[in-house]
Amino acid sequence: MTRAVCLLSGGLDSPTVLAYALSNGYEVFPLSFDYGQRHKKELESSKKICDYYHLNLKIIKIDLRAIGHSALTDNIDVPENDLKSIGNDIPVTYVPARNTIFLSIAAAYAETLNANEIFIGANAIDYSGYPDCRPEYFNKMEEALSLGTSIGLRNGIKINVPLQYLTKSDIVKLGRKLKVPYKLTWSCYNGRKKACGKCDSCLLRLKGFMEAGDFDDIEYEDYPEFYKTYLKNKHFDKF
C-alpha cells in the first residue's frame, strides 16, 4: 500500500481529497497546522473528520502570526464580498507563502514515513485568487521538493492535486459520491460559532452546493441572497 501525507484543513476541499486518496488505496497520514489562524474551528473539524475515518491526525504548531500581513493571522478584518469580485486580485485573506510552508513541512514528515507522495486540496477554478493554488506553482514546488529532500533524490516527490481543475460543484458531487461527511467540515474564515455566510470561503462553498443542486447543512449566521433565492426555488424544508 502506497503511503501519502494528506494536508487537511477541515474545509470542503481537503476532506474530499482525503476520501479520494483512501478510495484509491493509499495509506493516508493526515496533517494539519495550528498556525495562529483566527478560524481555529477548522482544526476541530479536521479532528472530527479523522475520527470518522479512523485515522490519526498529526497537528504541527507554527505561529504565522509572527509574520502576519493576512486577515487570517493579523488584526485585519475579513472582507465581505460578492461572487463577482472574488478572484479579481490577491485578497487580504492570503497568508504569505502558506502552501510553500505547509508543503515543505509535509515533505519533511513524508520523509520520516518513507513516503514520497503528498495530497493537497487546492483548486484553481472556483477560488480566491491565491498565487500558491495555481498549477504552475505546484509543478515547480514538486521539482524543488524532489531536489531538496533525501527521499526526493531517491524517488522524487509527487504532489497530488486531484481537485485542481474541478469547480466547487464538481467537488461537492465527487464528495457526495465518496460519502464525505460535509456536516463535519468548516470553511468560514471567521472563527465564530456559526459560519458567517459572507466571506469568500463561505460564498464559494455555498455556490458549489447550489450549482451541484445540493444543500449545505452546516449552520450559517445568514445566507447570501443568491443562496436564499436558490433555497426558495428548491423548496428546501430547512430554509
From Swiss-Prot:
Q: Which UniProt keywords apply?
A: ATP-binding, Ligase, Metal-binding, Nucleotide-binding, Zinc
| Pfam families from the UniProt entry | QueC
| InterPro entries given in the database record | QueC, Rossmann-like_a/b/a_fold
Determine the domain of life of the protein's source.
Archaea
Q: Which residues bind ATP?
A: L8, S9, G10, G11, L12, D13, S14, P15, T16, V17, L18
CDD domains per UniProt: QueC-like
Residues binding Zn(2+) are: C188, C196, C199, C202
As cofactor, the record names: Zn(2+)
Cofactor binding annotation: Binds 1 zinc ion per subunit.
The UniProt GO MF terms for this protein read: ATP binding; ligase activity, forming carbon-nitrogen bonds; zinc ion binding
| UniProt pathway annotation | Purine metabolism; 7-cyano-7-deazaguanine biosynthesis
- This entry's Enzyme Commission designation comes to 6.3.4.20
Show the catalytic activity.
7-carboxy-7-deazaguanine + NH4(+) + ATP = 7-cyano-7-deazaguanine + ADP + phosphate + H2O + H(+)
Say which family it is in. Answer: Belongs to the QueC family.
What does this chain do? Answer: Catalyzes the ATP-dependent conversion of 7-carboxy-7-deazaguanine (CDG) to 7-cyano-7-deazaguanine (preQ(0)).
Q: What is this protein called?
A: 7-cyano-7-deazaguanine synthase
- In its UniProt entry, the species of origin is given as Picrophilus torridus (strain ATCC 700027 / DSM 9790 / JCM 10055 / NBRC 100828 / KAW 2/3)
Q: Gene name, please?
A: queC
